[in-house]
């Protein structure tokens, strides 16, 4: 049954017939069936909600007729309806469409052939087309099933976690209710438990992230009690899978399958066995450039833009191009300033949920990614990749003006603005322009200071800065150097101080070779060579 908002949205999007493949009937709780609008259903339909009632499907041709505003409206309404079903505590298998919808992709576009074949497959299996039969979709892994618990159930699960924290892995995930609102993962009745380290995960995306560490990792759904001690690739190296033809080693079956597909043009055997996300009886499409395999032709087409460099989606604000529509959608939040995801610990806001999840590791102290060279740990994969450039010394991006080399293309683009004088980021309040968006964000705090210190009246743009500032008045210095005992109000200050003991000076002047502990000191020093006034 569509909500009033959904009806208005569907009316706005109609004007042509909406195609609806493979609906699912979802069993409602008894309390919901006995009261409210659902009680008015006929005997044959009572107690069931057809998934198509809250989900509208389009053919590819129909989807192309919608403008950007209509597509955004559709995306928001469908997620709202999905959240409504989830709040009822209904258990159902999640289709590929819903999973892609949560990631901001376009899974709701179906070809007529796909819809027909789906119905025929259900009929051949002796199942009533359009019904949920308590079994998984044959195109979806059994581990992709979902159980969305009600609010009271999640509170019970949180209480259990708080009373039985993991002794080995440290802090548990906090604010589950808050993260569940935005998280793309699936909440389970029982958490996934790592048999080697005892770490627990409520969401399958956290499950996958832990599983796909640089050293690998394998998790197991928690069994009764706290046993289930099995091997975990994060803590214990796992045996590799070797390709007999290509003589290459792989840590996962999916990697071996894709590698073997690149060596052979033979079609896969007709089998219904599901191996690491690939249905062996299903034809898949292989990229001619890198050999990566995909189950859908349109997914392959999107992937090939990486090799061709095609970027069909343009930002009408700054003219920047993107290869994926979702990347454009995320980029546009830079111009709108929208930051909907807030950290409950320090009040900091983020444009993307991934940024919030990564930031929360600062508070929990969780560091998942380890460098294989020096053993140093990092809270995010991107930070690990940037760190590894220190060991490889690779600097493939060279400035055509001065010959300076950079390890990242983005850093080269920022550097080139020092030659061109380009300052694309302008403050709408005072007109001052900046070469980097981060500099504009720092400057904007002058105009939008919301948090004021009650002791001295100084204002700050976010509550985390105010909390740090208040330590100046209280004299609190929780971060102490284990070498000399000197204490600091902030952790970054302790990290910089520690370099005095280690002798580490990572920032080197390319002109004279002088080394510095802090990057800011190097920047000030380089102005001497440039002839700028300090």
UniProtKB/Swiss-Prot annotation:
Segments forming C2H2-type zinc fingers: 192-214, 285-307, 313-335, 341-363, 369-391, 397-419, 425-447, 451-473, 479-501, 507-529
Keywords: DNA-binding, Metal-binding, Nucleus, Repeat, Transcription, Transcription regulation, Zinc, Zinc-finger
One record GO biological process: regulation of transcription by RNA polymerase II
GO cellular component, one term: nucleus
CDD domains: KRAB_A-box
Subcellular location: Nucleus
Domain KRAB: 49-120
Gene3D superfamilies hit by this protein: 6.10.140.140, Classic Zinc Finger
Superkingdom of source: Eukaryota
Predominant cellular place of this UniProt entry's protein: nucleus
GO molecular function, one term: RNA polymerase II cis-regulatory region sequence-specific DNA binding
Pfam families the record matches: KRAB (PF01352), zf-C2H2 (PF00096)
InterPro entries: KRAB, KRAB_dom_sf, Znf_C2H2_sf, Znf_C2H2_type
Family statement: Belongs to the krueppel C2H2-type zinc-finger protein family.
Function: May be involved in transcriptional regulation.
Record's protein name: Zinc finger protein 671
Source organism: Homo sapiens (Human)
Lineage: Eukaryota, Metazoa, Chordata, Craniata, Vertebrata
């Amino acid at each position: 049954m569509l909500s009033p908002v959904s009806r208005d949205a569907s009316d706005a999007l109609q004007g042509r017939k909406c195609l609806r493949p493979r609906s699912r009937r979802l069993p409602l709780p008894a309390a919901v069936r006995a009261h409210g609008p659902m009680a008015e259903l006929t005997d044959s339909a009572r107690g069931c909600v057809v998934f198509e009632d809250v989900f509208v499907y389009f053919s590819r041709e129909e989807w192309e007729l919608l403008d950007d505003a209509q597509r955004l409206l559709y995306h928001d309404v469908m997620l709202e309806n999905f959240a409504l079903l989830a709040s009822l505590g209904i258990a159902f298998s999640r289709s590929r469409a819903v999973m892609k919808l949560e990631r901001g992709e376009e899974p709701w576009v179906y070809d007529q052939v796909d819809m027909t074949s789906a119905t025929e497959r259900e009929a051949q299996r002796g199942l009533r087309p359009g019904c949920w039969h308590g079994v998984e979709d044959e195109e979806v892994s059994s581990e992709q099933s979902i159980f969305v618990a009600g609010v009271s159930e999640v509170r019970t699960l949180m209480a259990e976690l708080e009373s039985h924290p993991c002794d080995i892995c440290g802090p548990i995930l906090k604010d589950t209710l808050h993260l569940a609102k935005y998280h793309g993962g699936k909440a389970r009745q029982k958490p996934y438990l790592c048999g080697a380290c005892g770490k627990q995960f409520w969401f399958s995306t956290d499950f996958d992230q832990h599983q796909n560490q640089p050293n690998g990792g394998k998790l197991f759904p928690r069994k009764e009690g706290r046993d289930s001690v099995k091997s975990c690739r994060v803590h214990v190296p796992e045996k590799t899978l070797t390709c007999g033809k290509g003589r290459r080693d792989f840590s996962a079956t999916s990697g071996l399958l894709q590698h073997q597909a690149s060596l052979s043009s033979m079609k896969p055997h007709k089998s219904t066995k599901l191996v690491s996300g690939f249905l062996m009886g299903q034809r898949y499409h292989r990229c001619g450039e890198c050999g990566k395999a995909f189950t859908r032709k349109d997914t392959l087409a999107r992937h090939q833009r990486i090799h061709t460099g095609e970027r069909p989606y343009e930002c009408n604000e700054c003219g920047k191009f993107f290869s994926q529509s979702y990347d454009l959608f995320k980029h546009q939040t830079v111009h709108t300033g929208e930051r909907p995801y807030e950290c409950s610990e320090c009040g900091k806001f983020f444009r993307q949920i991934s940024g919030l999840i990564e930031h929360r590791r600062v508070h929990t102290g969780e560091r998942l990614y380890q460098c294989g060279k020096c053993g140093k740990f990092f809270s995010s994969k991107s930070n690990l990749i940037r760190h590894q450039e220190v060991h490889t010394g690779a600097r493939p991006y060279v400035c055509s003006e001065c010959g300076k080399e950079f390890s990242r293309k983005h850093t080269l683009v920022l550097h080139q603005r020092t030659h061109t004088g380009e300052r694309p980021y302008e403050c709408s309040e005072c007109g001052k322009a900046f070469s980097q968006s981060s500099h504009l964000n720092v400057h904007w705090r002058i105009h939008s200071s919301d948090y004021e210190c009650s002791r001295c009246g100084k204002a700050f743009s976010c509550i985390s800065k105010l909390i740090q500032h208040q330590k100046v008045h209280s004299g609190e210095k929780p971060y102490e150097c284990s070498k000399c005992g000197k204490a600091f109000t902030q952790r970054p200050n302790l990290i910089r101080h520690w370099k005095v003991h280690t002798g580490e000076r990572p920032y080197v002047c390319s002109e004279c070779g002088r080394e510095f502990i802090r990057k800011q000191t190097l920047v000030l020093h380089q102005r001497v060579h440039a002839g700028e006034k300090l």
